[in-house]
């Protein structure tokens, strides 16, 4: 009797990949962005990545040790969170602030909700948003590659009124101000290609998000070039590839992924063009995370052969 088949409605998810294997692939995919940050902004960028990652791992280990929970440091999820969180900061960020962000991401967002698989939103995303809301001036102190790390806040491509004046190659290669992980489009695309090639993620969500922003921006501005610059600027690409695709907080059905991608792209566009902020990707992903159960429900496939029960006629025999 122990070998009975369990019959349930679709979708049926079959995957032999381990959490450690999947997270390991994400770490590898993030390496081009880490190396690009080091080349563009210098050694301090690598130090910030290392400290933030170590802090995330340490907080996870200490929390599980104190509460006598199974140790999950080996699944590399804390490492992924640390790298993504660090790449969502400007290079001049004080290390103690990075540690605070790591605490918010690991302890508050992840562990207090039950650990990996139970968090309501991407931990690194929440860490970024909390730091941005509490330390806006620090989080927007962008540094150009040829400036000192203690320079004052500088404009990013999103803040430039006439984006047609921006050199496409400079934006693509990362010769501009911004968060460490978002400036080099080439590095992000290399990571994206690796994730898709290894089937760690599907291309549906990132492509849908970017396509939505591109189309809406082109229609609103009347310029495909401006739309292209906007898609390559800010946290759109980095967020679409590495944050919106989080396994726990993104839909698992194909239709659900499409709804989710369009929703995030739409909210990002609305915040950028009609809100008070230049960037809206983080808030769009957070709202998308919260909407994921509904996207899964809307995208749920009806089981083969399913027939909707007929309503009993009034006054009929019971």
Identify the role of each PLM range.
Residues 196-223:
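Conserved mixed alpha/beta catalytic, RNA-binding, or beta-rich assembly cores of soluble enzyme
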Residues 1-53, 57, 312-318:
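N-terminal signal-anchor module of multipass membrane proteins
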Residues 58-70, 106-117, 188-199, 241-250:
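C-terminal ends of transmembrane helices
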Residues 77-78, 83-149:
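Membrane-interface helix-loop-helix junctions at boundaries between adjacent transmembrane segments
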Residues 117-189:
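Long hydrophobic alpha-helical segments that form multi-pass transmembrane helix bundles
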